[in-house]
UniProtKB/Swiss-Prot annotation:
Its main location: secreted. The keyword Secreted applies. Belongs to the frog skin active peptide (FSAP) family. Temporin subfamily. Residues 23-44 form a propeptide. It comes from Amolops chunganensis. It is found in: Secreted. It comes from the Eukaryota. The keyword Ligase does not apply. GO terms for biological process: defense response to bacterium; defense response to fungus; killing of cells of another organism. Antimicrobial peptide active against a variety of Gram-positive bacterial strains but not against Gram-negative bacteria. Has weak antifungal activity against a slime mold isolate. Has weak hemolytic activity against human erythrocytes. Residues 1-22 form the signal peptide. This is Temporin-CG3. Keywords: Amphibian defense peptide, Antibiotic, Antimicrobial, Cleavage on pair of basic residues, Cytolysis, Fungicide, Hemolysis, Secreted, Signal. InterPro entries: Frog_antimicrobial_propeptide.
Length: 61
């Protein structure tokens, strides 16, 4: 039983490191891919519905 634990722990450790490295690489790719225009569009998409709801609440629509 003990002889199986070491390889399994090593495998788990290596898989965890590999997963972490892949996640960091993916985040770096997403940051490179995001352009300022795309970020502004995302902010506008989130901002416009809020403004619409606010105005409809004020004018009693």
């Amino acid at each position: 039983m003990f002889t199986m634990k070491k390889p399994l722990l090593l495998l788990f450790f290596l898989a965890t490191i590999n997963l972490s490295l892949c996640e960091q690489e993916r985040n770096a790719e997403e940051e490179r891919r995001d352009e300022p225009d795309e970020r502004n569009a995302e902010v506008e998409k989130r901002f416009l519905p809020i403004v619409g709801k606010l105005l409809s609440g004020l004018f009693g629509k």
